[in-house]
Amino acid sequence: MTTEMISGAETSLGGRVNFKVNGQPVSVSSDHPHLLAALREELNITSAKDGCSPSGQCGCCTVLIDGKAIVSCQQSLAKVAGREVTTLEGVSQAERESFANAFAACGGLQCGFCIPGIVVRAKAQIDKKGAALKREDMARHLGAHLCRCTGYVKILDAIETVAKGENKPVITTGGLGTRMVKKEAELLALGDRDYIDDLRPASMLHAALVFTKHARAKILTIDTTQALLEPGVETVLTAKDVPGELMMGIIYKDWPVLIPVGGFTSYA
C-alpha cells in the first residue's frame, strides 16, 4: 500500500486514514469532518457522544489518543493517523465495572449523556496519578465538560471512589424513603445505553432538511417532483403530511418547522 507521512503519522493515499482503535487497526474514509464522526458513523462506536460538534465545548465526545484525553470532534483524521485511540469500549472490564459501580453508587449521573466523556477524562487522570489524585485537581479538569444535571459534586465523589479503589454498595431494591440506584446507571456511565442518535436499526432511513433560501417569503408552491427522482430518496415529506402542530419553540411556539403552501418563512 502506498503511504505518505503527515505530521509524523502514517496515512494511506486513496481517501483512507489508518490508525488503531481499542488496539485494533482500522481504516476509515478521509471524508469525515473529524474523528468523532468516523468513530460513530463508520465504526459504529457510540460511547463517545455528540453534544456540540464541532465546537469542542461540552466534552461528551472525549476519547484517549495515545493515552491523553482529547475531545474527538476537534481532531482531524490527519492528526489521528498512525496513532492509538481508546474509547470506553476498549477499557478493561475491571475498570469499566469500577467506574460503573462508582457512578451508580454515588448518584453521579442523571440523564447520563455527558458521563462517558467524563469517565474517559477521569481514567486519564487516574492512570497518571492513581490514589494521589486530588479532588480539586480533578475538578479543574472537569472544566472541559458540561453537565446540566448534577452540579459535579457527586461526579467528583464517584471519581474519588475509583481513584481510591473503593467499592461502594449499589442499592437496587427498596421502597418509599429508600435511597436507590438510578435505573440503568451502569449502562449510562459507560455509554452503553443508546440515545436516539446511537440507534442503528436495520433498513434505517436518514432525513435531510431543506430550507428556503429566502428569510422572509410567502410559500406559493412546493414541487417535490425532482427530489423524488434523486437516487436513494424514498419519499419527501412536507407540511401537508403532518397532521399535528407545525410550530415549536423554547418559550413561545414561534419557530416554523415545516411551512405549508400559503405560509411565510421567518428565518433570521
Each model region followed by its residue ranges:
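Signature of N-terminal electron-transfer/Fe-S-associated modules in redox systems
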Residues: 1-174
